[in-house]
Amino acid sequence: MAGKYGGAAFILIYLIFLVLLGLPVLVCEFAVGRASRKSTARAFHDLEPEGANFHNFSYMSMVSNYVLMMFYTMVAGWMLYYCYAMAAGKLDGKDSAQVADYFTGLQDSAGTMTLWMIIVVVLSFGVCSLGVQRGLEKITKVMMICLLALIVVLAVHSLTLDGAMEGVKFYLVPDFAAMAEIGIGNVIFGALSQAFFTLSIGAGSMTIFGSYLGKDRSLLGESLHITILDTFVALMAGLIIIPACFAFGVEPGAGPGLVFITLPNVFNQMTGGKIWGALFFLFMSFASLSTVIAVFENIISYSMDRKGWSRGKAVIVNMAAMILLSLPAVFGFNILSGIQPLGAGTNIMDLEDFIVSNNILPLGSVVFVMFCVSKYGWGWKNFIKEADTGEGLKFPANVQKYMLYVIPAIVVVIYLKGYYDMFSPKGPVVLTVWMIVSLLVLGLVGWIIFGKNKTK
C-alpha cells in the first residue's frame, strides 16, 4: 500500500495510527479474551453487566471472520501457486505482457484457483486440528522463524541492487505533496484500514489468543511486542519490494498487480531471479498462512464455545463450510465475473473485502474499546485490572477519556469519509444510497454498544 499511497508519507501516518489506535484496541481484545478465557462466542456474555447488549457483537465478529476467509483463502492459494510456479520455472523468459497474461490465466481458471484454495483450507484446518500446543504454537513458531529469516535475506538482496537507493528514498522520505495529490482522505483511510488489518483487530480474532495468554505478563507489554514484530515484517516487506521496483524501473503500485505481475517481471530481470522469486513467494505464503491459521482457530473456538462441539467436529464442519463459502470469490474472476457489486470493474472479492476492511474491522474496534472503557460494558476498572495483571509495562491510567471519546470519534469520521471518497465518483444517487448504508451500519453498532437487553 505504500507504493499506492505515496511511500513514506503513508508509512508515517500508518505508524501513528498503529500506536494511537491499533495498540490500545489490541490490548482491549487481549483483555477480553484473557479475562473470559473464551472466544467472542461467549466472552461478552461472561463479562458484560446485566442488561447489556454487547454479546450480540459475537455474531458480527463471526460474520467478519468468515467473510475475511472467503476471499483470503483464495489469495493465500495464489501465493502458494506462485511459489510453485517460480520454483518450477513457469515464468522463465516471459516478457511483461506474458507475465500479465499468466496471472490473468490463473484468475480465468476456476479449477486451478479452487484447487489451491482447497489446499490452503485443508492445510490450515489441519494445523488447527492438532490443538493449540501440539499444532498452533509449534507450527506457527517454525513458520515465523522461517518468515523472519526469509525477509532479512530478501531485504538485504534487494538493497544491494543497482538503483535500489532511489526506492529506499521513496520509501523512507515523506513526500506530502504526493500525498495531497492522491488525496489526504484516501491516504488516511488506507493507513487506518491497514493498521487494523495487519494487527487483525476489530473482528475478535485476537480475543481467542488473549484467552490463551497467562497472567504472568501485562497485556500492554505483550501487545507492544506483537505490534513491533508486525511493524518490522511490514516495513521489511516494503524494503524488499520497492527498492527492487526502482532498481528495474518498474512503478510500485499496490494490490494483486504489484505482487503477481510487477514483481515477477522484476525477478525475471534479476540474476538468479527464479530462486529469489520462489523465496519471496514462500515468504508471502508463510505470512498469509499464519493469518489464515489464526482466524481459523478463532472460528473453531467460536464453534466449540457456542455449540459445545469437540475440536474435531468443529474442524470438519467449518472446513467443509469454508471451502463452499470461498467459491464465490473464486468464481467472481471467471464464471461469475458479470457480477460487479460495487460498480463497474469490481467483483465479489471486492465486496467481501469492503465488508471486512471498511466496515467490521474499524467499527468492531470501536465496540471493543467501548466495552472496555465505558459504563455500558465491562468498564474501565475491570479492564485496567486485567490489562495490568502480571509483570511488564502498565497501561496508562489517564487515557480513559481519550479511549472513550477520541478513538471512536476518529474511527467514525474516517469511516464515513471512506464511504464518501469511494462512492462520490459514482454520482449523487449511488453516493446517497451508500451513505445511508453506512449510517445503518453505524446504527447497528450503536445498538450493540448502547442498547439494553433483558435476556441473553
Task: Place the predicted regions along the sequence by residue.
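Helix-loop-helix connectors at the membrane interface of multi-pass transporters/channels
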Residues: 42, 76-108, 211-216, 221-233, ...
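Juxtamembrane transmembrane-helix boundary signature
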Residues: 13-52, 244, 248-251, 444-455
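Loop-to-transmembrane helix boundary motifs in multi-pass membrane proteins
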Residues: 114-115, 229-235, 286-289, 303-339, ...
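Inter-helical loop and helix-membrane interface segments of multi-pass membrane transporters/permeases
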Residues: 2-5, 40-60, 73-133, 162-189, ...
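Membrane-embedded translocation segments of transport machinery
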Residues: 1, 137, 141-289, 293, ...
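Membrane-water interface regions at transmembrane-helix termini and the short interhelical loops
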Residues: 4-5, 53-69, 104-108, 119-143, ...
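C-terminal membrane-solvent junction of multi-pass transporters and transport-like membrane proteins
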Residues: 57-64, 308-319, 354-415, 427-431
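Select transmembrane alpha-helical segments in multipass membrane proteins
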Residues: 8-13, 52-66, 114-120, 180-192, ...
